[in-house]
């Protein structure tokens, strides 16, 4: 029979279960284990259990998708009816088997089990023969059946038959071997290896022997094979051990095998020596003798190995559970076992190498011809995505995840066993299952005697959790003798039931027994969560060095974690691929043919001293990996290892908690305990255990309750609800009384202790006073005082130590730059030469210029012409030369673009000026100021900007304000759609460029790795300058993306270019020589540099880079289009000296007014909260602060209260303004940092000493990098008394992130501004006594030297001068440590040993106090702009920046990171004239002589000249009324002066609704603006009406009005004359607006609208003949009175002899008169009204009057209606006179509604383009402007029509808009307003509404 025959069970994994509770039953599990042809099916395990696992020493044969069957012989299927393929048993979980597939059982099939007909399962695609189907009468649920035991004589519904021939015939031609370097799969060897070898098989069973086997013998064979399959040892026999001693240790991975000696283990199955073939050593194959097994090391014999008990629990399965299936195997009689008849027992060379987490479920067998497999096989890991643990833990999991079984039984202590089984190793046994000891046959056993196993042995290991079987205690298996010394069996059926207890009574007996057994045997093995396992194999350094000899590279990266040092191991393959986990290594080995390197040669443990070690360190350039030297590696490994736990003491170990057993199928629910007793009694034990106050009465009560529960369970009694409630109530009352008594006792004790402590405090104080009075008296009374003094001294030392520790902590933290006293001076930067503007204005200029360079092309600017330079912009803002025009043109274009997009805000969309929308008004230099003012008002800009523009134009504004306005427009344009689209395009190009750069970098990295491998040089040396700082992230991303591309080459189509490049690089690496690789690297380096520059240019093009700030808070900028680095001063961040003094005085008053009693209470609370704090910790992290301990951020509460004037508020942990101590003299540099070994502050005593050591090392490191801290620490040789104090030479300003003081010569100055939080270690201040002087803040402000420990504060830059406590009382500090108060609250604290604080802390404290003081920033550093043009200056700046400065640290980082780019920027050529100081004096003179009134006067005078020019133009065009001439020019007068018309009210032209409100300014005759207004008004009135057009003169809007002119007083008749005139609404608005003009821009708007309304083309000078198209012969040219067309009299048909008199109309006008109706042209001029009559117009030559070219303009017109002499407008106006009063009121109401705040949606008609769907919903739209036009035209005949239109407006609003919308709300408001006003005016007309 071949060795594979025994493998007929298939397992697909175990269900995930916690290691502490064992395996739980899974609903997806398959059939039972010992079913004929039924495999065990388990769901997939989690992380390291991929696929199959070894259960009971069995491994699987086929893949997880196939199932194994046991192919039985034909006679076995017909001789016994017990073979039922559908009968299943649970062998592992102590529960019943799962229901069979028989439909007669009415049970569901397992969800994950696919059965074939007959209950068979295919193995590798082969389906076995059909079994005999089970009948419905065979019940498969053992829980419902009778109990079955071995040898009980009871007929079993299930039997077991076994035939060795079946096993021999199962797999006749299959043999599995390991591929040496191939992928993790298996192949069938062409040469079979049955038994020990294919050529040697000395005891193959014959056919006749197997056919004549007795049924009992068959059972014995099957049981023996089962034991062989479940056995845990390798094949071990006397012959094998004698011939090859090295076979006595066949451990997996080289680990020591667990061997039970003869006196420690008794086999439960005794083999039959008569059939044994292991006695003959000749059966050993030659190959086995020559082939080393598993390890080439010398193997020790079994006798020399220490006995280690092997766990029988597999992933939490204990021994009792493993034998459950054997108990469930019913046999007819006593089994007679001939175990050695099974041929597999002698298969000594079959070893399963299947790892625990292998995903392939077929076993691997080692052929004698296959090479040895060392350690952990490459085939171990096939699942790479399931391992989520860390690398160091993964290695342990992979080597420890296989558990080993215990021996099934253990011998009695005093009875040596006589036989011991030689368990055969099944070919399916995994390495974890093949590590049990090989036993020997005792000489006492007769070689011909068989030793059947008594049945009590099997009963003794029956699972206790099975309800059908009695629970057998494990003690029976430990004490019951198995065989007699003579080897004869002694069956004792009664002995098997001596320790049986019902399973329902104690369900957890088996786990308890398992825990006891593990406690007794677990001392010699490594214990894990899943059971007892052997010690894992750790790869040796020699093995780990092997890959390094074949081109691999191993790196260990060490960095400081949150609590300790952490290490991470990386492997780099020969191709440069980085691997951080075992799955990556295994995949790499499987994909690449790597000789001599396998999985066991790798170790990811960072404690393995192999490879290169790197440590992450903080350098001036940032965090960097620094390679460690060989001397540093052992200390780092020790730091990584850390504190290892003490080995487990099993003698004192507590018993494991019993895991909860999950209820199986069919089991009744667990009885709930609260149902047996009342809830109060049931909860009482838990509550008492929680309170930990179990008294004797409570224990007795708990015992009584348990007894009652047991009695109720037995009797099944139940109480009535009434009795239960009464009983519960009584118990509850008793319990509550007891709890109250307990609480009272505890409270009384606490009060007593508190009173005692207070009395003790008072006593100590009293005694101290008495001691001070009587110093010379000594006696018994002084002893308590001495004790208290010692206590206080201990407390003072503790507080001093904590304070000093906090000071050391703060000395390491970044702090405000102006608080540091050891600065190096910054280099002097060059100020911008031609800069005249202020700092803020120049900042806005930079913004404007950079914006125009970036987006000017998008906005339509010509970058070469339209974009001004900084010099031109500065001159224009200063109104110098022609630059002003360029700035005004820039303003016009920017404002025009802003009005277009983004436009006005939504609430200002209807804003109009002179009836025109702002976006439609043509912008010019003259009127842009008024449009700009309206735009700023719409965006709610500050009123000062808008008010200044009311009376003064833009060019008269100050330069800083003009620059701010232009910057505002730029910021608004940044939100426009066109700019956003441009930014998106740029970002897309940046992303594409970055992707290309990553691809090139990936190729370059691979080539460098290959070159480094070939040349032997490290890869770091080959990196050029482009691989320096700031590239870690891109490199990492590139590696990750390249790894993804390798795994998904076929699917990833977007990275084809990257894959092509990678393949080309690999080809070059494999086939190219070193020169070729260098050429490729050089080529790719150039491409990388190109992409980096392009990326940098693209990314910098759209933004200005802020590099950071220095100690003076100056900002460093890099601009895309300007050369150099710009440095901007911080203006406005300083506080005036008067404010500082005022704040300081108020602070002093608050502190000094604090009552002493409040301070005493604060002291007691402080010291009491710190009484339990230990003095120090010698190792580990510092303890966390207790809730009562003082936090540094609470130390400045008093200052915060004074600053915010909220002394009653609690302190929040957010950053608050903080106080600084006064300036201290700066100390001179000292010569050294470290003290000698014998110094008072030597290391090793406390946390104070460790902190001092850490501080000194940090200082040394900092000085070594920057040499900036030479004066940071003082040594005893350079104490404060020996050094000369000198004031600091670097003056700085306090940081807004921290509280600072600006010291003066006489006291501290304070600056309160926004702060950044300061984190520090907790440091309670020393207690202060009441009777001793406590200078508090006065001490800090005095001139006393602050070199004592009590004057320091651990939180920088926080001053330890006040402390916020729950009471809100400030805590004062003592000035001297010797003057501290003494308090007894430190009783019980351990006394600090060692020397008192050394001078070191006093010196550090003195240095720290100097850091608490922020120096003021020099005024010359606060304002202005500098620039850096020299790269050498940049280098000097880098060296001068302080590494502890909170700002300069970040600045140093950015300057170092972008140093190359910044040097290029500094070397760019200059293109702006502002950097050339040629015209600087002229500009400065212009700034000094700047006067807004002069600029405004110049603008007003220019407007007056433009009005005069317009008058001349009208007269020259002959468009004026006949007889009017231009007045004398006023612009040449010398008496003109400037007069500003300040607005009396906030009235505004476009905001107040057609200008009907506000006062009219009084005009003066010597003001140019007033003269321009008056002359322009006269010009409008004297322009001929027929030469006007829209927008001022619309023909359909013309109305005729009358006015009464009274005669002068001197006239004899006091009569008045009535005149009539024509006017339009727009003309009226224009006139009102002109009256209220206060600026030149407003006048220009009115003048521009009038100019656009004049029909210049109708001028007489431009009239041509309709026939000949010529304009000559003016004396013969007739002008039409209707359209001003002309015609020569000789060209007219019929021909005229002379010019006719009167009106003449051309043919075009005559044809239009006939077709049009009179109603369509209501406002036609009088002279044309004759054409509107019903009779035809004829002009007889004799009757009609003629006129010449110089016709009289004032000739009367022919009346249209001779009968009444009234025109239709006059009649309509006459008919409306009766309703004049009503309509007047309507006009008033309409005017009020238009000026209402909520009327903005109804002022103008709704634009259907903007509001889609409005016309579909609203059929009759109406608005206020339409109502006004109708009202002015006389369209309303009654007030009811007006009211109907008003209500129509509101009804339309309610119909179209939601009520809760803005427009809907406005509609409701306006409706209520209209109704209220209408009711007031029309009390009696409510019915008309």
Swiss-Prot record:
Residues 1777-1881 form the Bromo domain. InterPro entries: AT_hook_DNA-bd_motif (IPR017956), BAZ2A/B_Bromo (IPR037374), Bromodomain (IPR001487), Bromodomain-like_sf (IPR036427), Bromodomain_CS (IPR018359), DDT_dom (IPR018501), DNA-bd_dom_sf (IPR016177), Methyl_CpG_DNA-bd (IPR001739). It is found in: Nucleus, Nucleolus. Residues 35-59, 479-489, 498-509, 716-726, 1190-1231, 1269-1278, 1331-1346 have a biased composition (Polar residues). The modification N6-acetyllysine is found at residues 672, 790. GO terms for molecular function: chromatin-protein adaptor activity; DNA binding; histone H4K16ac reader activity; RNA binding; zinc ion binding. CDD domains: Bromo_BAZ2A_B_like, HAT_MBD, PHD_BAZ2A. There is a cross-link at residues 857, 1141, 1163, 1662, 1695 (Glycyl lysine isopeptide (Lys-Gly) (interchain with G-Cter in SUMO2)). Ubiquitinated. Deubiquitinated by USP21 leading to its stabilization. Residues 332-726 are annotated as: Required for TTF1 binding. Residues 1-59, 384-433, 479-526, 638-791, 1039-1063, 1147-1247, 1269-1397, 1720-1778 are annotated as: Disordered. It comes from the Eukaryota. Residues 648-660, 678-701, 731-740, 748-791, 1742-1754 have a biased composition (Basic and acidic residues). The modification Phosphothreonine is found at residues 499, 540, 1738. The keyword Coiled coil applies. Gene3D superfamilies: Bromodomain-like, Methyl-cpg-binding Protein 2, Chain A, Zinc/RING finger domain, C3HC4 (zinc finger). Keywords: Acetylation, Bromodomain, Chromatin regulator, Coiled coil, DNA-binding, Isopeptide bond, Metal-binding, Nucleus, Phosphoprotein, Repeat, Repressor, RNA-binding, Transcription, Transcription regulation, Ubl conjugation, Zinc, Zinc-finger. Residues 423-433 have a biased composition (Low complexity). PROSITE patterns: BROMODOMAIN_1, BROMODOMAIN_2, DDT, MBD, ZF_PHD_2. A zinc finger (PHD-type) spans 1662-1712. The keyword Chloroplast does not apply. Residues 1042-1052 have a biased composition (Acidic residues). Regulatory subunit of the ATP-dependent NoRC-1 and NoRC-5 ISWI chromatin remodeling complexes, which form ordered nucleosome arrays on chromatin and facilitate access to DNA during DNA-templated processes such as DNA replication, transcription, and repair. Both complexes regulate the spacing of nucleosomes along the chromatin and have the ability to slide mononucleosomes to the center of a DNA template. Directly stimulates the ATPase activity of SMARCA5 in the NoRC-5 ISWI chromatin remodeling complex. Belongs to the WAL family. This is Bromodomain adjacent to zinc finger domain protein 2A. It comes from Mus musculus (Mouse). The lineage of its organism: Eukaryota, Metazoa, Chordata, Craniata, Vertebrata. The gene is Baz2a.
């Amino acid at each position: 029979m071949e060795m594979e025959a025994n493998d007929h069970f298939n397992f697909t994994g175990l269900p995930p279960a916690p290691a502490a509770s064992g395996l739980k039953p899974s609903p997806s599990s398959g059939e039972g284990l010992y079913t004929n042809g039924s495999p065990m099916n388990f769901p997939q395990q989690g992380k390291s259990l991929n696929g199959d696992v070894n259960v009971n020493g069995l491994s699987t044969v086929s893949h997880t998708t196939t199932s194994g069957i046991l192919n039985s012989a034909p006679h076995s299927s017909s001789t016994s009816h017990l073979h039922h393929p559908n009968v299943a048993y649970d062998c592992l979980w102590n529960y019943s088997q799962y229901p069979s597939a028989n439909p007669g059982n009415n049970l569901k099939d397992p969800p994950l089990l696919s059965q074939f007909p007959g209950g068979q399962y295919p193995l590798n695609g082969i389906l076995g023969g059909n079994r005999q189907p089970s009948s419905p009468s065979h019940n498969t649920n053992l829980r419902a059946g009778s109990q079955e035991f071995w040898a009980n004589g009871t007929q079993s519904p299930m039997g077991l038959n076994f035939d060795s021939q079946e096993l021999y015939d199962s797999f006749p031609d299959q043999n599995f071997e390991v591929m040496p370097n191939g992928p993790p799969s298996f192949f069938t060897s062409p040469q079979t290896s049955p038994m020990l070898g294919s050529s040697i098989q000395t005891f193959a069973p014959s056919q006749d022997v197997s056919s004549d086997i007795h049924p009992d013998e068959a059972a014995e064979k099957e049981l023996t094979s089962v034991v062989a399959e479940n056995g845990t040892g390798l094949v071990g026999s006397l012959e094998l051990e004698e011939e090859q001693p090295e076979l006595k240790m066949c451990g997996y991975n080289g680990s020591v095998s667990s061997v039970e000696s003869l006196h420690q283990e008794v086999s439960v199955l005794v083999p039959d020596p008569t059939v044994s073939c292991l006695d003959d050593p000749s059966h050993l194959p030659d190959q086995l003798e020559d082939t080393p097994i598993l390890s080439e090391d010398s193997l020790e014999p079994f006798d020399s190995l220490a006995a280690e008990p092997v766990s029988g629990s597999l992933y939490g399965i204990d021994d009792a559970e493993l034998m459950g299936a054997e108990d469930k195997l019913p046999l007819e009689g006593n089994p007679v076992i001939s175990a050695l008849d099974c041929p597999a027992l002698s298969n000594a060379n079959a070893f399963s190498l299947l790892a625990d987490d292998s995903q392939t479920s077929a076993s691997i067998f080692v052929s004698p011809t296959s090479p040895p497999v060392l350690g952990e096989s490459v085939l171990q890991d096939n699942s790479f995505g399931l391992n989520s643990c860390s690398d160091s833990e993964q290695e342990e999991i992979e080597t420890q995840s296989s558990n080993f079984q215990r021996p099934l039984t253990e011998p009695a202590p005093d009875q040596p066993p006589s036989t011991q089984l030689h368990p055969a190793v099944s070919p399916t046994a995994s390495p974890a299952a093949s590590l049990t000891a090989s036993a020997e046959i005792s000489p006492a056993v007769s070689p011909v005697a068989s030793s059947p196993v008594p049945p009590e042995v099997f009963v003794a290991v029956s699972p206790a959790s099975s309800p059908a079987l009695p629970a057998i205690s494990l003690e029976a298996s430990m004490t019951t003798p198995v065989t007699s010394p003579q080897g004869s069996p002694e069956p004792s059926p009664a002995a098997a039931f001596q320790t049986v207890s019902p399973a329902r009574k104690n369900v957890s007996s088996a786990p308890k027994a398992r825990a006891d057994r593990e406690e007794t045997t677990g001392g010699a093995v490594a214990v894990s969560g899943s059971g007892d396992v052997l010690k894992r194999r750790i790869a040796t350094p020699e093995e780990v060095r092997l890959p390094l000899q074949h081109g691999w590279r191993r790196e260990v990266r060490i960095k400081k974690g949150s609590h300790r040092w952490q290490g991470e191991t990386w492997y780099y393959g020969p191709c440069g691929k980085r691997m951080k986990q075992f799955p990556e290594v295994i995949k790499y080995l499987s994909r690449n043919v790597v000789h001599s390197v396998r999985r066991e040669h790798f170790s990811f443990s960072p404690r393995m001293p192999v490879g290169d070690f790197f440590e992450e360190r903080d350098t001036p350039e940032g965090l960097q990996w620094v390679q460690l030297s060989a001397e540093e590696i052992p200390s780092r490994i020790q730091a990584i290892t850390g504190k290892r736990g003490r080995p487990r003491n099993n003698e004192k170990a507590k018993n494991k908690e019993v895991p909860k057993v999950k209820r199986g199928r069919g089991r009744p629910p667990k009885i709930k305990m609260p149902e047996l007793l009342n809830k109060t009694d049931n909860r009482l034990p838990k509550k008492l255990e929680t309170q930990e106050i179990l008294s004797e009465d409570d224990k007795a009560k708990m015992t009584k309750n348990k007894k009652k529960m047991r009695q109720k369970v037995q009797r099944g009694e139940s109480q009535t609800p009434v009795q239960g409630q009464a009983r519960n109530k009584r118990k509850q009352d008793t319990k509550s009384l007891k709890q109250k008594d307990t609480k009272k006792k505890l409270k009384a004790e606490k009060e007593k202790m508190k009173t005692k402590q207070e009395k003790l405090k008072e006593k100590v104080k009293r005694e101290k006073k008495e001691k001070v009075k009587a110093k010379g008296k000594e006696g018994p009374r002084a002893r308590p005082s001495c004790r208290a003094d010692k206590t206080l001294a201990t407390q003072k030392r503790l507080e001093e130590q904590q304070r000093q520790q906090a000071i050391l902590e703060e000395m390491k933290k970044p702090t405000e730059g102006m608080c540091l006293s050891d600065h190096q001076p910054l280099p002097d930067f060059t100020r911008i030469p031609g800069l005249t503007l202020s700092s803020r204005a120049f900042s806005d200029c930079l913004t404007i210029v950079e914006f125009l360079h970036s987006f000017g092309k998008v906005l339509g600017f010509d970058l070469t012409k339209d974009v001004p330079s900084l010099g031109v912009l500065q001159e224009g803002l200063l109104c110098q030369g022609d630059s002003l025009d360029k700035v005004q043109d820039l303003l016009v274009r920017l404002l025009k673009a802003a009005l277009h997009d983004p436009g006005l805000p939504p609430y200002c969309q209807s804003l109009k000026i002179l009836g025109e929308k702002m976006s439609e008004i043509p912008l010019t230099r003259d009127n842009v100021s008024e449009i700009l003012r309206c735009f700023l008002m719409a965006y709610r800009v500050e009123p000062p900007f808008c008010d200044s523009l009311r009376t003064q134009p833009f060019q008269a504004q100050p330069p800083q304000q003009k620059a701010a306005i232009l910057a505002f427009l730029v910021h608004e344009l940044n939100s426009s759609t066109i700019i956003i689209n441009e930014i998106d395009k740029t970002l897309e190009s940046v992303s594409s460029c970055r992707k290309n750069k990553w691809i090139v970098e990936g190729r370059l990295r691979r080539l460098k790795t290959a070159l480094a491998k070939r040349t032997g040089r490290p890869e770091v040396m080959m990196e050029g300058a482009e691989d320096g700082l700031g590239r870690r992230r891109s490199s990492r991303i590139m590696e990750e993306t390249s790894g993804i591309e390798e795994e998904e080459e076929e699917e990833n189509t977007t990275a084809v270019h990257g894959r092509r490049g990678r393949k080309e690089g690999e080809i070059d690496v494999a086939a190219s020589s070193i020169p070729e690789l260098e050429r490729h690297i050089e080529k790719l380096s150039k491409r990388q540099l190109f992409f980096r520059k392009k990326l940098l240019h693209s990314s910098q093009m759209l933004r200005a880079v802020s590099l950071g700030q220095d100690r003076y808070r100056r900002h460093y900028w890099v601009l895309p289009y300007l050369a150099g680095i710009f440095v901007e001063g911080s203006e406005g961040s300083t506080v005036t000296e008067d404010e500082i003094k005022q704040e300081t005085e108020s602070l002093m008053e608050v502190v000094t007014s604090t009552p002493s009693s409040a301070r005493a209470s604060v002291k007691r609370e402080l010291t009491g909260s710190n009484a339990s704090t230990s003095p120090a910790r010698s190792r580990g992290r510092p303890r966390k602060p207790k809730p009562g301990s003082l936090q540094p951020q609470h130390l400045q509460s008093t200052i915060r209260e004074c600053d915010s004037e909220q002394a009653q508020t609690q302190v929040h942990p957010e950053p608050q303004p903080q106080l600084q101590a006064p300036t201290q003299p700066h100390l001179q540099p000292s010569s050294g940092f470290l003290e000698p070994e014998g110094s008072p502050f030597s290391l090793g005593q406390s946390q104070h000493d460790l902190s001092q050591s850490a501080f000194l090392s940090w200082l040394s490191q900092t000085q070594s990098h920057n040499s900036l801290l030479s004066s940071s620490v003082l040594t005893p040789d350079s104490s404060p008394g020996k050094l000369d104090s000198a004031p600091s030479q670097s003056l700085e300003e306090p940081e807004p992130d921290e509280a600072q003081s600006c010291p003066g010569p006489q006291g501290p100055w304070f600056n309160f501004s926004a702060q950044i939080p300061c984190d520090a270690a907790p440091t309670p201040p020393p207690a202060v006594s009441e009777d001793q002087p406590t200078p508090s803040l006065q001490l800090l402000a005095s001139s006393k030297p602050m070199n004592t420990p009590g004057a320091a504060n651990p939180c920088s830059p926080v001053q330890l001068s006040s402390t916020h406590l729950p009471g809100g009382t400030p805590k004062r500090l003592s000035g001297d440590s010797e003057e501290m108060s003494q308090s007894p609250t430190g009783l019980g604290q351990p006394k600090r040993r060692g020397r008192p604080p050394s001078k070191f802390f006093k010196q550090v404290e003195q240095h720290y106090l100097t850091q608490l003081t922020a120096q003021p920033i020099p005024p010359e550093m606060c304002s202005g702009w500098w620039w850096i043009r020299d790269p050498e200056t940049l280098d000097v700046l880098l060296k001068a920046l302080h590494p502890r400065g909170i700002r300069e640290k970040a600045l140093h980082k950015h300057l170092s990171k972008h140093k190359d780019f910044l040097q290029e920027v500094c070397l760019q050529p200059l293109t702006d004239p502002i950097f050339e100081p040629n015209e600087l004096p002229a500009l400065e003179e212009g700034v000094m002589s700047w006067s807004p009134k002069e600029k405004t006067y110049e603008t007003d005078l220019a407007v007056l000249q433009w009005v005069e020019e317009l008058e001349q133009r009208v007269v020259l065009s002959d468009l004026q009324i006949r007889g009017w001439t231009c007045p004398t020019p006023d612009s040449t007068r010398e008496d003109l002066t400037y007069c500003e018309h300040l607005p009396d009210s906030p009235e505004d032209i476009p905001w107040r609704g057609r200008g009907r409100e506000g006062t009219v300014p009084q005009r003066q005759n010597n003001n140019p603006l007033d003269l321009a207004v008056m002359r322009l008004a006269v010009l409008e009135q004297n322009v001929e009406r027929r030469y006007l057009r829209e927008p001022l003169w619309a023909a359909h809007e013309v109305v005729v009005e009358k006015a009464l002119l009274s005669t002068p007083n001197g006239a004899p008749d006091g009569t008045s004359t009535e005149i009539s005139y024509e006017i339009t609404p727009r003309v009226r608005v224009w006139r009102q607006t002109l009256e209220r003009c206060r600026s030149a821009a407003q006048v220009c708007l009115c003048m521009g609208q009038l100019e656009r309304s004049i029909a210049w083309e109708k001028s007489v000078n431009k009239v041509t003949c309709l026939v000949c198209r010529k304009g000559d012969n003016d004396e013969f040219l007739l002008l039409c009175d209707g359209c001003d067309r002309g015609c020569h009299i000789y060209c007219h048909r019929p021909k005229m002899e002379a010019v006719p008199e009167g009106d003449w109309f051309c043919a075009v006008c005559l044809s239009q008169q006939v077709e049009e109706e009179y109603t369509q042209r209501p406002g036609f001029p009088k002279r044309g009204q004759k054409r509107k009559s019903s009779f035809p117009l004829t002009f007889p030559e004799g009757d009609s009057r003629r006129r010449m070219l110089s016709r009289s303009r004032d000739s009367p017109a022919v009346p249209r209606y001779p009968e009444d002499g009234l025109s239709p407008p006059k009649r309509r106006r006459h008919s409306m006179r009766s309703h004049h009063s009503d309509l007047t009121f309507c006009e008033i109401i309409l005017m009020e509604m238009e000026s209402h705040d909520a009327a903005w949606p109804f002022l103008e008609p709704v634009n259907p383009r903007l509001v889609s769907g409005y016309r579909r919903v609203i059929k009759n739209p109406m608005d206020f402007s339409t109502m006004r036009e109708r009202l002015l035209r006389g369209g309303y005949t009654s007030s009811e029509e007006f009211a109907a239109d008003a209500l129509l407006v509101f009804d339309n609003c309610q119909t179209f808009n939601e009520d809760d919308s803005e427009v809907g709300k406005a509609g409701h408001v306006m409706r209520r307003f209209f109704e209220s006003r209408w009711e007031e005016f029309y009390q009696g007309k409510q019915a008309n509404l």
